[in-house]
Each structure stands twice: as structure tokens, then as C-alpha cells.
């Protein structure tokens, strides 16, 4: 019986590059059957692998740092979790969708819909929407029953009203499932024991709405159960679902199995339940009936999802196989019917899933109900039958023929009503329903049914509706895909825009040009443009649906220029070269009909591939000069047109010149000036201004000058001068402006331009002799020609312009002007007056310099005094006055001290050579440090310099003067120490000076300075910092004086100074400081750490007798390995603080007794665990086992287990035994007892420990010491762990204990936890050491061994029989067959071989098997071929035996398979029969099978010595229409009867007449008469009469002639009778003409079949209508088009 399920392997994850260790529940997720996501570690980098199940060959890898990844069920969206950080990322958009930082760790998460992720923490469950920015929403708290469980699943119903959380945990050697069912409406939870669950919306028979069902399965000690219950309140009108509670079978071998996942197909109503050990169970939701169970995987299936393609389930097992299970639609119903003997369930499944297999049941039920008059029920059965098996014309005919049973609707109407309620009608049902409805005029019903998708649309239905409603018919044609009728209907309804779109969509090609012409003639031309546009825009492969030129012709036929223009503008917007002729045509039609439109088109520059020359000429004729110029390329044409500037836009014309060459542009400009300079000058200037860079300014200037147009030159140059750097342009502009009287512009350009030649312009302006000299003044002022300017103006009597220059133009030039006037001997009074009158700003220093150079400084005295009196505070004025006072010795010292405005540097510099004292005063007043130091050094003013430095308090200045390169440093230091510091009382002065000496690294001078301050009883003697500095400086400069200062001084920082002394290696001085200030702990540290004298330290400690001193000494002694002395010192210090160091040192030096003393003291002070732990170990080390036992028996904080380990590691097994026993560490105790040789005790301890590692250690030790009985006891606890089995076996085998190992495994097979590895390894051991036992072992336990592994072992051991057995069980039939053929003496068994060979996949093995049988078992060869015949290539098989010349051996096989009508078989068998001269068999063969070369065989048999074979040859010729050849052969062998029969069969009169002639020639008159009978209808009576008369055998021909006369008579009588009947019918028809033959149709009457015709109608689409019926348009009827 075929299985009711389909099992398919989609993928193996290892083949996609996934390593098997990564295939785990935590690393692999599958949220849907679209994608699989795997987290994988590659080296040090973690990656996520995304496998698209639609494209498994191309997995996507991305680096990640997340610890969990789940993929969106349908979209390319990843959810990633790293710790408490959650993130959603869109892979396609490469963008982060959402992120959240969770408060709790998420232990499980899952997509429960396309928009929601469920998050499960240790305490609660949350829902997180991927839409918006909202954080996860808490749904409910976890129930306490799920505490400590591993969450494996979470499910929600369709409306998220019911939620269930599922977890598992280990309890009492089994896996317990815990579930929490939660209602979001009632906010309550219910704990349930269960392992797998899901929700489903399922519609129960009789209910209007689906029920919300909750399905879950549980495995307990009492067995497995599946529960199906309804949750929530049933929908209104629904009958509550009856709870189902059914058993889930678990065998003894699967006692540890339990459900892991569940999926329910809502459409099929089937539950798919998968268990841990790979079993799948199928249940019907409605009845709870178990449909099928089987094992689909030997490995655990740890993740599943719904397989949407078939409604089944998809899962992944530990090996990485991606498997799916679905129902087999072809076999499910037969399986339920025959195997389960449940026809009711089979019917339900067939209806629910629309499955085949129950046709007979439905037909029987329908016929029974129909025969009983239950038409309503039978209609329901017919409507619900799967795959429409009862929805046939025969069923409709049945309902049409049955009478109406009462006032209600007729059976046919009931049937159609049920069909409409359940779904869509088929084509025949639609037509039968719509005919009477349309006849009654109720087309709204049809419209309603069409909108509800209840009718199957077809051409016939559209034709039926079209006379009543064209739009509805169009809808039907569209839905029924009848393109030619759709296009026709669109045209009739004016929906032209839809024609192209529809035709393209369905691939139909209508006559578009015809449709376009119809639109242009009968409709708005604009619609034609739109339609034409569609013909182009909806093109395929870049080609329009109609030729563009022909489309344009269509427009031109009706003179539709504007619509055609609109169309072409849209079509040609791509501006392609191949469209040039169309562009030309577009422009031509508009230039002739609408020049403005053409102008707009050209203005937008839409086209570039038209005939420019032709269009240019047309533009000129149309008055579009601008467009004509754009198209002209000949200079003559351009010059002819361009001079008409009044007809051209200036802006455009300027832009146009940009497209001309330089030479052409200049020529055109000249032509424009020559034609009409007044009219064209302005535009010429504009053009020249814009293109001067390209045309060349020199050429343009020359052009204007040649036409003597200085005005044009002025305007041209004025437009470019501000941007030009050409000196010539600027000069020409100044010239043009001067000549046109534009003096203000001359002033501006002279003032602003940077490019003209100043000398050339100055000379031009002098020669021009302008009335206004301001341009000349500006040029000379800007270019420093003021001296020349003053000379020119003074000599030309233009003094007023000198005053204008300094007073209005540039007052800053006054000093130069004064100097120039002095040079020309101008009077002092005039100069003074000029200075006084000049109110602008000028440089007084420069003025003073100019006057001073000419020894006329006193000239400024009164002017300067007046300025000071006016309140002038500028430095220049006061500097000049200071110089005058110093030179005149007019009380300068007072001026220098009191005047705040002069520049100290300037005046000081002026005084240096005249009086250094005045220079010092000036520099001091301005803090000019560098100048002051320099003047003091040069003039030995060190005392003044020292006072200045102390008061200045500037470190930079001190650094400069105290530099060792300063030759005057010593003199300055002496003045600082002797004079400057003695005079000051400001501590800040002292501080800065001392710091400066320190920074200058002058320790000796600093000591000298500090002694002066500190030791000479000054005001700063008790200053702490100064005392510190003195001692520190002495440490650095003179160490011999340090002890003296320590003793003399008391107000210094002793700890800091002592520490510095230590770093300076002044240990005695540091010790003296600590001792002086009673810091004894630090003092002894100096003796210990620096002086390194423990004896002095010990003496010092005895003197002090302080705990901290003793502790410091003890630590030092400990570091020097003086352990006993250190312990004594620690005890004197009574300090347990250093117990860590003491323990480490005593342990290193083996001073365990001293350690005991110290730790006993320390224990009194502190009950630290470490102290007591080390005391225990020290007692163990000293062998004080009694004290040890007493200590650990009492209260303590020691780490007994840790000490036990240390004792064990150090070989102190007696102590370890005591300690391990104390803490009940039986695992370690057992190993310790093994070391002590107490094996029985070790086994007992191991039993208490119950640890695999312990069992291994004890077992191995027992094996090593020959205690095999105890070793076996231990081994039984090891072998049940598959991971440990290999190590155990290797240990035994390496030591040669094979018998004991086999005994151990044999004893272990009966254990409850026996697993596959044990059976496998025992089989391998049997193959190596006891091959005689292997067969029995495999026959008993083949299903529990790892067959591939045992296969290798059996092959290596040459156990061929066992190898075949395993290959058979493993379904490797190819290898099994090969092995039997290679080793037949040991492994071949006839029946077994035939069973195996029929299952092999490799067809080549069939032929190897044939050869094998030929070699070893030739008599059984036909039996083998019988078995293989369903799968053999019979042609190849025949060829195989032909090559070996063994065809006779396989004759039975050939007989058996001849019914296949294979050519090779037929020819081989026929040849064999020929060889055997079996003509009867050959005749039978060729009559039964015709697939062979008939002609070749006929030709072969034609020459055969036996007549029967030649007769067969004639038969074959006849069968191949070689009648003549066949008859000739019969005549040759005198087979006259055959010849007559063949001549009759040939239907050839000539052959028949030839045969008659042959008989007459041979005087075979009887055969002649017989031939007349056989060939009666082929012969001509006149020919026969002639032959008979010639040969005088009329008697032989007379029977033939009598029969001919009778036939002629009969035909005449029939013809007369037929004519008489035709006349009667015609008369009757004329008499009945005009009568109505049929009543109005009603729905209950039904409709005639499409092929039927009514009386008075002719049938067909083009026939005439019946009387009283409307005409139907047909293909041949008027009005169709």
C-alpha cells in the first residue's frame, strides 16, 4: 500500500558550508520555510549564514557580534540580540529599523507575526512591534511552574488573544514539559503539563465561523496524549467544539521520547506532531483520529515550521538535514479508506482537502440520494465532491430531467444555488444557468454573479450577453481572455486608450492603423493623438506598434496638424539620429501651417537631426530671421540677414555671435557698422563687450578707430576696462574718455585702475593740458611721482593744485611735498602756512625726518608746541619735542620722567650716545628690558640693573641675565646679594629671585643667597620653604653641610626631606631625621631597606619595642629567608597580617613546624578561611593526623576539599583519604582509595559519587591491576554514555583485554540506557575477534547499530555475508548486489539476490548481474530477467545477449516481454523463430506485435525455402501496402485464395482486373468466378462482360451480372422514394410557416445543449433566428463589425 505522506530532503546544511558542531538549537533558527539562519564561528570571527531555501546554492555570510539571530518570516529583515541589546536590521535597505536596550536578559525570542517579536525573559514575556518607536510591551509574568525550564517555543493564535509559553526540564530521569496558557482578554494564566502546542482556526462542519482551537501534546509516565480543545467563547451561531483527547503511541524502544514540536494545517485540518527521536504523527483535528505514524529521522529534530507549499511541516535535525513531511494527495484518501477502514474520515478529508481517491464513494452516495428523491442532499454531494468529479453535463441533465417536487425551487435551481453558495461555476454550468436568466431579462443577476466571481467567463458567455449589455460582455471577454472580442468591444464603446494596453498585456496584435483612422474620422482628433501616443509608448523592444510615417499619413489625411504636432513632440523627445526625417517633417508642416509653433519648437532646441539647410530657408521665407540665422552656415547668408538688427532680439543676437568663428564675427560686425552705424552701434558694442576675449580687444579697438567711432570705443572699453588687465585697454579708455569729455571717468579710472602704464598716462595728461589737473594729481599720487608733480605744478604756476593735493587729495603726502618745496627754495612762511592749513592725517615722524634731513627741525618747534597745547597725545609729536628738549638741554630729565606719551624706545635710542642715564630713565619707564640691559652692561650700571631685576620679578629676564654666557653675571649677582635683596622687604621679591637662581642652576650662589637670608637672623629666618630649600640645595651642591643644617634647623618638612635624602642616598641623614622626629617605623625601614643592616635593625627594634617596628623587621627577615627569626619577630609583633607571605615562604623552604606555630598564633587573631586551610595542610605535612582529625572534626572555616586535592597531588593519600571522607567527596575518595590499593572501597565510593569521570578512573585502574570483575562493574556505568564509549574500548584494546571488553559490552546490552554506540562497537569487536557471533548479533540488533560504521568493519574483516546483510538493511542495494557478485560462494543467495537486484538504483548493475548469471547460474537467467523486466532497457538487453550469442537462452524472457512491442525484442524473437523454422509462432508474433522492420523481414522471408515463410512474406508486403508485390508472390506460390483476398483489401480496381486476367490466362475459371465475388465492388460490369464474352465463359460471370442488375434496381427505387418525401416535407413547412413554436423560457426548464437546434432555426452563429426571437449577431450576420 502506498504511503499517505511525502517525505523530502531539501538540503543538508553541511553541504552549504555549515559545520556540524554549529547545528544546535541555540545557533540555528528557522522562523519560516523561506530562510534558515545559522550563527557560526570561523576562526576568531563570528558570522551569520543566511540560507534562502529558494536558492540554497548561494548562502549569504555576514560578520556579526550577536549571540542570537532570527529572520523575519517573509522579508529580508534580521533581528539580532547581543546581551541585553536588541536590534532589527533591514538587509535589503542596509538600514537599522529599530533598536532597544532591554533591562532583563532575553532567554528566548521568536517572530509570532510579520510585525511582532515575542521576547521571553526569566520573569516575563514581552511583545515588541517593529513599527514605530515603542519599546517592548509586557504581556504577562512567567508562571512559577516554568521556573528553571528551558524555553523551547512560544505560540500565539491568529488574533493574539491567546498565548502559550512552552518549556522543558529534567525531572526523575525524564523530560517534563511545562506550558503556560494566557488569555490577553481575561489577563489570567493557566499552567499545563505539555511539551508541544499550537493554535489553529478550524471550521467544523455545520458551523458558519471557524473555531479557535488549542492543540497540545504531553508525554508522561503513563504514555502520550494529544488534546484538542476550543479556547475562548464560541462565535455566535457556532456549535462548541467537542474536546478531543487521544493517545500518542510510544513503544518500549521510544520510552524516552517526547514531543518537541507541532504544526497544524488549517486548510487540511491535519496535526503534524514531531517527537525528539524523529517520529512524526498525523492526526485529524476534527475527530482526533490518528492517520499515520512513522520515523522520519534517526537524529533529533530540534526546530520546525510550517511548510506553506503543501501545508505540511518542515524541520532540521542534528545532522543538518532540512526535511519536510506533507500529505500525499494521491494516496491519502485510499490509505484512510483501505488501511484505516475509515470511509467517513476519507470522505471528510477528500472534501476538505479536495483530494482524489474517493470518487467511487461520492458517485455511489450521489446516486443513492438522487434515486431516493433527496435532490437537495444529492445536490450538496455533487457540489462538494472533490475535484469536481460530479460537476458534469450529465449531472445537470439529470437535474433538468427530474420533475419539480412542490412549490419550492426546482431541483436544478437548488443545485445551481448550492454551487453558487460554495464557489464558482464551471463553463458548462455557467452557460446553462445564464441562458434562461437572460431570456427572462434579469441581466442584473449575471452582473452580481460576475462581481462575486461566481461564473467562469468564456467567449460563448460573452456572445450570449452582448446583445443585452455590451459593457458586461466586455467584462466577460476580459475575464475569459478573448482578445479579438475585447478589442472589438473597446472600439464599439469608444475606449480606444485601453486597446493598446490590453493587446500588449495579452500578446494580441490588432490592426492599429485602421483603429487610428476610425478615431480621426469619427471622433476628436485629440483622441487620435492620444491613441497614436499609446501606439508608440507601449512599444516592445523599442519598436512602435505601427510605423510612424504611416501614423503621420493618417493625421495628414484629415489635415490634423495640431494633434499630429502634439503626438510627434512627445514621440520625438528622445532626439535620436534615426528620427531625423520625422523631425524635418514635423518642422516643415508647422513652418507652412503654423510658423509660431515651429518657432517655439526651434526655440526649445528639442531636435538636432533634421535637415538644417532646408529648414533654414523655410524659416527665412516665413520671416523667422532669428531661426534662419541659427540654421545658416554660409557667411554670405549670415551677413545678408544679420544686418537687419531691428528685426532681431538684441539679447539673442549677442548670444548668436558666440556660435560664429572669430573671423566671421569680425566681418559681421564690420558689415553692421558699415550698413548703419547709428542703428547698429549699440548692439555692436554689446557684442564686442561680450566676446572681446575671443575676438581680441586690439582688433575691436582698431575696428572702432577705423570707423572713427570714439563714442563706440568709449562704451566698448568702458564695459571691459573694469575686468581687463591689459594696459593698452586702460590707456585707450583714458584717451577715449578724454576725447569724449568724460573727465570724471578719467579721474575714476586713474584712481581705481591697477593696469595702466603710469609714466605714459602722466605724459599724456601733461600734453593734454586739461583745465582740471586732478587726474594728473591722482596718477602721480598713486605711483609715487609726488616730487615730480610738485615740481611740475610749482614751475607752471599751479600752486593752488599743490594745496588741493595735500588738503583734499592725500594729506599723507605732506612730508614729501614739504621736502620738495624746501628743495625748490620755497619760503618758510609759505611752508609753515601749508602745514598749518593741512588738517588731514599725515605721518609726523616722516615730516620730522624730512625736515631733520635738511637741518630745519626748529622749523616745527612752534607748530609742535601748539599741537601739545591743543591736547595732542600721539607719540610722534612728543618724540619730536623730546628730541628738541634734549638737543637744547631744556630740563630733559623732568620731561623723560613725567611725560607719559613719548615712545621710550625711540627716545632711549636717541639718548644712548648723548647721555646713558637719560637712556636708562627712558627704557625703565617703558620696560624696554633688552635695551635697558644692553645700556647697563655697556655703561656698568649693575646696581641699577640689580634693583630693576628684583622689582621687575620677570623669570624670562632673570634667565637672560643669569645665563652663563653673560660676561657680566658675577658683577650682577654680587649687586643682587649685597644691595638689592638687602633693600627689599617684599617676600614676593625674595621668592622670585630664589626661583630664578634655582632655574639658572646656580646651587653655590643660591646657598650663598639663602644663608644670607636664613642664617643672618633676617625677617625670613624661620621661613619653612627657605629652610627646606637650603637643605635640599646643600644635598645637591655640598653634602658635607647637610647634617649640619639638619641639626641647626628645626622648621623644615622632616618626612619629605628624609625621603629626598633617601633618594639621594643620604641614608644616615635620613635615619637621623626620622630618629630626631620619632618616626621609628620609617627609621627601621631605612636600616633595613637602605643600610641593609639587620643587626642594627634588630637592636633598634629591641630599644623601641613597638609592634610595627617588629613587624617591619619580621618582613625583612622573611625576605632574607630567615624564616625562624621572622616567625619569632611576627609572634613578638603579634601581627597575623602577613599570613599569605609567611605561608608561601614556609611552603617554599619546608618550615612546616614554624608555619604551624605562626598559624596557631594567627588563628587566635583571625578566623580567616585561608589561615585555617593552610593550618590543616601544615598539620598534614607534619604528619599530625590525630590533630588533623580533631581539627576538622571541630568547627572550622578550612577548605577541606581543596586541601584534600593538594594532599592527593603531593602523594599524601592517607591525609587525602581523611579529608575527602570528611567532605563526602566520593569521586576523589574513590581515586584516592585506588592509589592506596583499596579497589573494593574505591568501587563503593564511585557508586556513591555516580560520576562518569570517577567510574572511568576506577575502571581503568582496576583494568591496569587485573581487577576485571570490578572493572566490569564500573564499565557498565560508563558504556551508557556514548561520548565515553570509544575511550573505554580503546583502553581495553590497547592492553589486549578483548574477551573482557566483549563480556562487558554483552552485559551492557540489557541495560535500560543501552544506545546505538554499544551495539555498534560490539558488532565491530565481533568482526575482529569473534566473527562467528556477528551474524546473530546483526540479525537481532541491526536496527540499533550504526550501519555505515559496521559496514566498514565487516568489509575489513572480509565478512561478506554479513556485509550483504547490512547493505540490504541500509538500503544500499547497489553495494549489496555488487558484493554478492564479487563473493558469490559466501554471500550469494538466489532469492535474496533477486530481491536486492530489483531495488538497485544503478542500471549498469543489471547487466553485470546478467553476466554473473551467465558465468555461474545460466539456468536461472530467465528468472533474473523476469524480476528485472519492469526496469530493463530491453533494446540494450537484447543487444547484450546478441553480442554474447545467447539469444536462444533467453527465449522465455523474450516471450514474456514481447507484449511491450519493442522493436529489438520483436526482431530478436522473430529471427529466433525463423532459425527454429517455427512459421506458426512467427505468424502469431508478427500479427500480435508490429514494431519491427516489416520490409526487411518480408524481403528476408521472400527467399525462404519453406512456402509458409514465403506466405508470411506476402502477408507482410500486403500489410505495408505493397499489394502488387504481395499478389505476385501469392501467384508465384499458387496461393490463389490469398491473392484474391489481398486484391479485395487493396481497394484497387486495376490490381483486381490484372488478377482476373491472370486467372483467365491460366484458364483458372473457378478462381475467376471466386474473384468476382471477392472483388465485387472494385470491378466494372462492362469490363467483366467483355472478358467473359472473349473467353466464352459467360456462365462463370452470370452470378456477378445478376447481382449488379439487382443493385441498380434498388438504387433507383430509393431515389424515387426520397424525392417524394422531400416534396411532402416542403409542402408541410409552407403550411406551418408563421407559427410560434416555443414558450418563454423559465429557469426550471433548463436550456438546450449548445449543438441542438429548434424547429425553424438553422443553428450556428450566423443562422436566421426563430420566429419571435431576437437576432443574434454571428460571424456571417450583418452588423457584426
Swiss-Prot record:
Disruption phenotype: RNAi-mediated knockdown results in defective endocytosis by oocytes characterized by an accumulation of aggregated yolk protein in the pseudocoelomatic space. Pfam families: Clathrin, Clathrin-link, Clathrin_H_link, Clathrin_propel. CHCR repeats lie at residues 539-685, 688-830, 835-974, 981-1126, 1130-1271, 1276-1422, 1425-1568. GO terms for cellular component: apical plasma membrane; cell cortex; clathrin coat of coated pit; clathrin coat of trans-Golgi network vesicle; clathrin complex; clathrin-coated endocytic vesicle; cytoplasm; cytoplasmic side of plasma membrane. Residues 194-255 are annotated as: WD40-like repeat 5. Residues 1616-1635 are annotated as: Disordered. Residues 22-65 are annotated as: WD40-like repeat 1. PROSITE patterns: CHCR (PS50236). It is found in: Cytoplasmic vesicle membrane; Membrane, Coated pit. Residues 148-193 are annotated as: WD40-like repeat 4. Coiled coil: none annotated. Disulfide bonds: none annotated. Gene3D superfamilies: 1.25.40.730, Clathrin heavy-chain terminal domain (2.130.10.110), Tetratricopeptide repeat domain (1.25.40.10). Residues 300-328 are annotated as: WD40-like repeat 7. Keywords: Coated pit, Cytoplasmic vesicle, Membrane, Repeat. Residues 106-147 are annotated as: WD40-like repeat 3. GO terms for molecular function: clathrin light chain binding; structural molecule activity. It is a peripheral membrane protein. Clathrin is the major protein of the polyhedral coat of coated pits and vesicles. May play a role in yolk protein clatherin-mediated endocytosis by oocytes during oogenesis. Clathrin triskelions, composed of 3 heavy chains and 3 light chains, are the basic subunits of the clathrin coat. May interact with beta arrestin arr-1. The C-terminal third of the heavy chains forms the hub of the triskelion. This region contains the trimerization domain and the light-chain binding domain involved in the assembly of the clathrin lattice. This is Probable clathrin heavy chain 1. It comes from Caenorhabditis elegans.
